[in-house]
Amino acid sequence: MNELLNFQTTMLDKNAKIYVAGHRGLVGSAIWKNLEEKGYTNLIGKTHTELDLLDGVAVRRFFDEEQPEYVFLAAAFVGGIMANSIYRADFIYKNLQIQQNVIGESFRHGVKKLLFLGSTCIYPRAVSYTHLTLPTN
């Protein structure tokens, strides 16, 4: 993740307006923290209550008001492996809707760069990862 953020942030103005969609999730919070550590001060994050990314009108209004220059899209409709397997159509539909809204408004508003991170499931809540080993080099 650090290599990705090092590459992405080397070209950004420290005062640029940066929107991190999904800033409270696993990946989005890591991006937010990394940007803060690198001295970025104009970060925008909205909770689901503040901005429903499934609502295209609300997303357009947000982009109209905030005018972000850069967007990290780490937001997703999530629910765990079991819910993902039971409600597959709901998950793909809602996630495509979020992506369409954020990517579409980024394009319409002339966002300089957008980084889209997509995954159906990152980590289950209660699973042991003891079988994984750390890289040796």
PLM regions: where:
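NAD(P)H-binding glycine-rich loop region in Rossmannoid oxidoreductase-like domains
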Residues: 57-96
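N-terminal Rossmann NAD(P)H-binding glycine-rich loop of SDR-like oxidoreductase domains
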Residues: 17-34
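Adenosine-cofactor binding site in Rossmann-like domains, unifying the SAM/SAH pocket
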Residues: 42-61
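Conserved small/polar residues in nucleotide/adenosyl-binding loops
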Residues: 129-136
